[in-house]
């Protein structure tokens, strides 16, 4: 049975792991790195670059290089958070027909799950290269505070990438798994996982218990902000640089897409450097130009300056910590360990804030970039039956309910309820002889339904005429282990029932997913075609080079017609390389091989003649070295001692 891999699909970076021989193995990608930038670039010739190659060309291709797409997954175009990002991204965020936030590259509209699927395909290929076998199943992580639409969209991305998503698991829970299984301490421990990544923030309070030799991980509460992360920290630095440059040079860089891409790269680098040094210098020559000529950017940023720029962002992470502690029904002093996850937790100021709130030093023995993927791989081994000593009890992050009379949100499942779970409640009609009811499903904590996230709606029709309040409509909410919701409504009188898996009143339809799966498969074929073309080109180039070299050395030994034939074949190969058709390249290479046979014969004959000449000269030298007179007699001699 093939292994179930664990994938941390991050906003900024992604990581893949697998359980191998009882140990978690973080798998290096083709570039030799343990994490892969979650960046996808769409090239002019139709090629799709993922990871480091996409990041390297971002400066020259900003409009078609997509990053931080996870911030859009499962979101509506009109949401405040999306509107805020539209003006910050160099690429185009557009409104889909169903109201979702999509992206546009090279004239095509793409759904965020489609883009994320490219990253997942890279992760899948990385695992396959390591394991040496096909991989079809995965556990994929999401921020704990992701709502139903975002979870569903992540699952869709997995399907488009050719993966059966066995489980969607919360990132802090995955990190706790990786941490908890490592430790030998006995007894119950309560841990706080503070996860500040590239685009999202989560905090979870988790209890790790030893139950008859089995480690039980129970999530007590979770909270967070799905639009707060390293990208926002980068943006603060970018805004500061733009402001300083405008003051100094009078030029507004925010209007220059190419400059913005360079600033983004520089801001990220500066942020990372300031975690280990007190000051860094941003030096970007030829950042822009005006009538007076080219402009260069040179700016020093201190750690203190960075901290003042992002202070409010760090402060925003503390309130969710407070709420999570309260919801878990514990005190801060009850927390035994604080685990930091996500690249942003390397920032000293973040660590300081966390220590200040929890009153203890955070653990330093967890790799913030790899713990989540490691936990996902552990969960994969549990699902495949390889591990039987782990039990994971996760929760739903937000309350779920339906809209009832007066627009009120009637909660069916409270936030932080352990999943999977099921809950039923009976409702009735609001009007006399009402023939149908519309069940509108919401997720959130507000008392009024409209203030929460609308997940979807469906109708239950065919209710027999009756006075209001008489029909009995049983509504059932069922959350599976992935945190995905299924809702049904049943008329107890007639037995009529209608049910839906909440796909949000947006999301991708089954047809769209199937189309994207086919597109992805076609892309895989295209990738294979491009790889074969590259190989054919390399072989043709090598043959052209070798033939030209031989022609220079041995051309004068050929007849004019033979030489002409080879030169024509060489020219044909070079022309076919420009056209880029593999079949044509192969045909012209074959023709060149045939044409240069005579050249090969001459080279072979020449080499044989040289070899024969060398052997003859060696023989001559050996003969010359022999003594002239073979009739040599050894002479007797006698030693005569002289008297002194």
Curated annotation (Swiss-Prot):
One Gene Ontology term of the molecular function aspect: unfolded protein binding
Record field: compositional bias (Basic and acidic residues): 635-644
Pfam families named in the record: HSP70
Biased composition (Low complexity): 609-625
Name of the protein this chain belongs to: Chaperone protein DnaK
Gene that this polypeptide is encoded by: dnaK
Induction: By stress conditions e.g. heat shock.
Family: Belongs to the heat shock protein 70 family.
Taxonomic placement: Bacteria, Pseudomonadati, Pseudomonadota, Betaproteobacteria, Burkholderiales
Stored Gene3D superfamilies: 1.20.1270.10, 3.30.420.40, Actin, Chain A, domain 4, Substrate Binding Domain Of DNAk, Chain A, domain 1
Family annotation (InterPro entries): ATPase_NBD (IPR043129), Chaperone_DnaK (IPR012725), Heat_shock_70_CS (IPR018181), HSP70_C_sf (IPR029048), HSP70_peptide-bd_sf (IPR029047), Hsp_70_fam (IPR013126)
Its job: Acts as a chaperone.
Protein source organism: Bordetella avium (strain 197N)
């Amino acid at each position: 049975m093939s292994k179930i891999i664990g994938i941390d699909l991050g906003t900024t970076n992604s990581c893949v792991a697998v359980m191998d021989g009882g140990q978690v193995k973080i798998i290096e990608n083709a570039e030799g790195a343990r994490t892969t930038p979650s960046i996808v670039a769409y090239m002019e010739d139709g090629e799709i670059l993922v990871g480091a190659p996409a990041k390297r060309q971002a400066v020259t291709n900003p409009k078609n290089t997509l990053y931080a797409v996870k911030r859009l997954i499962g979101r509506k175009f009109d949401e405040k958070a999306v509107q805020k990002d539209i003006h910050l991204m160099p690429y185009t965020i557009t409104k889909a027909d169903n109201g979702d936030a999509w992206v546009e590259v090279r004239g095509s509209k793409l759904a965020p799950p489609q883009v994320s699927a490219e990253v997942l395909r890279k992760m899948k290929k990385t695992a396959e290269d390591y394991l040496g076998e096909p991989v079809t199943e995965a556990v994929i992580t999401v921020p704990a505070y992701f709502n139903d639409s975002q979870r569903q969209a992540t699952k869709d991305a997995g399907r488009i990438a050719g993966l059966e998503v066995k489980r969607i698991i919360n990132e802090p829970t995955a990190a706790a798994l990786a941490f908890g299984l490592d430790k030998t301490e006995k007894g119950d421990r309560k841990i706080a996982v503070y996860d500040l990544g590239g685009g999202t923030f989560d905090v979870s309070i988790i209890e790790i218990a030893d139950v008859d030799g089995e480690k039980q991980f129970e999530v007590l509460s979770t909270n967070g902000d799905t639009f707060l992360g390293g990208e926002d920290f980068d943006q603060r630095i970018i805004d500061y640089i733009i402001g300083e440059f405008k003051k100094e040079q009078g030029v507004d860089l925010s209007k220059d897409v190419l400059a913005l891409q360079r600033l983004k790269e520089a801001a990220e680098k500066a942020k990372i450097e300031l975690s280990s040094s007190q000051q860094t210098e941003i030096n970007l020559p030829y950042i822009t130009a005006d009538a007076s000529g080219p402009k260069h950017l040179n700016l020093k940023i201190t750690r203190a300056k960075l901290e003042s720029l992002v202070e409010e962002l760090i402060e925003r992470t503390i309130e969710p910590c407070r709420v999570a502690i309260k919801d878990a029904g514990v005190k801060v002093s009850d927390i035994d360990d604080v685990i930091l996850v996500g690249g942003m937790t390397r920032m000293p100021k973040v660590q300081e804030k966390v220590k200040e709130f929890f009153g203890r030093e955070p653990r330093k023995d967890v790799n913030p970039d790899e713990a989540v993927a490691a936990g996902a791989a552990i969960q994969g081994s549990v699902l495949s039956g390889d591990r039987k000593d782990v039990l994971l009890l996760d929760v739903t992050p937000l309350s779920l309910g339906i809209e009832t009379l007066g627009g009120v949100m009637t909660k069916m499942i409270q936030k932080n309820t352990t999943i999977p779970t099921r809950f039923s409640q009976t409702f009735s009609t609001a009007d006399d002889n009402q023939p149908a009811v519309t069940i509108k499903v919401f997720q959130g904590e507000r008392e009024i339904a409209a203030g929460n996230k609308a997940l979807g709606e469906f109708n239950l029709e065919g209710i027999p005429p009756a006075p209001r309040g008489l029909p009995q409509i049983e509504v059932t909410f069922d959350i599976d282990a992935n945190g995905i919701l299924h809702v049904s409504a049943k008329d107890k009188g007639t037995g009529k029932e209608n049910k839906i898996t909440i796909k949000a009143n947006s999301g991708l339809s089954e047809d769209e997913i199937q189309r994207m799966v086919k597109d992805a498969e076609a892309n895989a074929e295209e990738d294979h075609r491009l790889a074969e073309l590259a190989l054919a080109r390399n072989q043709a180039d090598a043959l052209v080079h070798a033939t030209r070299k031989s022609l220079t050395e041995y051309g004068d030994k050929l007849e004019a017609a033979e030489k002409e034939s080879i030169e024509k074949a060489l020219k044909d190969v070079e022309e076919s390389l420009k056209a880029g058709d593999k079949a044509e390249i192969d045909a012209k290479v074959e023709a060149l091989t045939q044409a240069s046979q005579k050249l090969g014969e001459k080279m072979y004959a020449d080499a044989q003649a040289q070899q024969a000449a060398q052997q003859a000269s060696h023989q001559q030298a050996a003969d010359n070295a022999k003594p002239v007179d073979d009739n040599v007699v050894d002479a007797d001699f006698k030693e005569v001692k002289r008297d002194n």
